């Protein structure tokens, strides 16, 4: 269904605010995940460690609300996701809520673990579409889920 002008106008009026919140929260989340020993890798262009950081900085005012990260070997991706209290498991993007999904269980599921590994998709890779929740609440949720 296509949005009517009546439905689309309120969404467009708050778009800049939502993108600003999503981007700032995503950067904060990427930083705390990158600093955690239980996280193997974080993929977010707002991090100086990202190979495309300089390009993203030249092109964009903000880095967006989408990031992904890998848990260290031996950590159960699904157990981690089940410990999240604020983030919602879902495959869509761009919601006002933070959405998470294990990447291996999206469109790549039918490829099998060997093919995914050859493409650089770890079984513990989690995609996060950051919403507009309070940033500190979001950071707390992702931190507490890392606890065994």
Language model features with spans:
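Short, well-ordered beta-strand elements within core beta-sheets of diverse protein domains
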Residues: 10-17, 64-72, 127-131
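Short, small-residue-biased leader/transition segments that mark boundaries at the very start
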Residues: 2-9
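Ligand-binding pocket scaffold of soluble enzyme catalytic domains
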Residues: 8, 19, 36
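Conserved small-domain helix->loop->beta segment predominantly found in fold-type I
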Residues: 27-91, 95, 111-117
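PLP-dependent enzyme catalytic core of the Aspartate aminotransferase-like
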Residues: 18, 75, 98-148
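A non-catalytic, amphipathic alpha-helix used as a structural packing/dimerization or gating element
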Residues: 17, 21-28
